[in-house]
């Protein structure tokens, strides 16, 4: 399951929910699309997920309506939970442009600079308007006294190329970030 957003407060008398998007693809939130709601940390516990169907989504207001949630009381039960969508459904509904990737496809890729593997991507975080690759450093570099985990901004200055077929991200200047972490 992929995190689409975080559900905020209930809005109005018809069960509206404020949605704080975690996705770059709001076009996936269409009427009739199946989504799941669960605590944000429920990734490993499938029984925590409760399924819903989107009734409507107002992108300008970040307002989500689910088909079976029609009262403020029912909406409040979902406050502070995560809104999830299956990976297959996300990939079916979201059309990527050249150079765009799903976060889930980048997790696990090796981070390489020159001929040296620096580590692998274990998570992607968005801080302000910038995405950061959280990289778990290779054991050999950690044994040399470098940080176990470091962040690389997803910027041209650091990221040369993302090669999904080779399962790697080539970088430049990223080792400097590691050395200064």
UniProtKB/Swiss-Prot annotation:
PRC barrel domain boundaries: 98-177
The record's note on its domains: The PRC barrel domain binds ribosomal protein uS19.
Annotated Gene Ontology cellular component terms: cytoplasm; ribosome
Q: Which UniProt keywords apply?
A: Chaperone, Cytoplasm, Ribosome biogenesis, rRNA processing
Q: What does the similarity note say? A: Belongs to the RimM family.
Domain of life, source organism: Bacteria
**Assembly and interactions?**
Binds ribosomal protein uS19.
Q: Which SUPFAM superfamilies match?
A: PRC-barrel domain, Translation proteins
User: What's its job?
Assistant: An accessory protein needed during the final step in the assembly of 30S ribosomal subunit, possibly for assembly of the head region. Essential for efficient processing of 16S rRNA. May be needed both before and after RbfA during the maturation of 16S rRNA. It has affinity for free ribosomal 30S subunits but not for 70S ribosomes.
Where is the protein situated, by its record's location annotation?
A: Cytoplasm
Record-given protein name: Ribosome maturation factor RimM
Gene3D superfamilies found in the cross-reference section? PRC-barrel domain (2.30.30.240), RimM (2.40.30.60)
The protein's predominant localisation is: cytoplasm
* HAMAP family to which the protein is assigned, alphabetical: Ribosome_mat_RimM
């Amino acid at each position: 399951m992929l995190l689409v957003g975080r559900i905020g407060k209930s809005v109005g008398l018809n069960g509206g929910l404020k949605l704080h998007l975690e996705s770059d693809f709001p076009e996936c939130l269409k009427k009739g699309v199946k989504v799941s709601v669960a605590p944000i940390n429920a990734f490993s516990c499938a029984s925590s997920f409760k399924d819903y169907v989107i009734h409507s989504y107002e992108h300008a207001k970040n307002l989500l309506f689910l088909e079976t949630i029609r009262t403020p009381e029912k909406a409040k039960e979902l406050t502070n939970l995560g809104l999830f969508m299956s990976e297959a459904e996300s990939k079916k509904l979201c059309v990527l442009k050249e150079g765009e990737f799903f976060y889930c496809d980048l997790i696990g890729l090796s981070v390489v600079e020159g001929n040296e593997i620096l580590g692998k991507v274990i998570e992607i975080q968005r801080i302000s308007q910038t995405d950061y690759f959280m990289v778990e450093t290779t054991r050999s570099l950690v044994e040399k006294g470098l940080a176990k985990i470091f962040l690389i901004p997803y910027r041209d200055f650091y990221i040369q190329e993302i090669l999904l077929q080779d399962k790697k991200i080539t970088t430049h200047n990223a080792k400097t970030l590691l050395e200064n972490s």
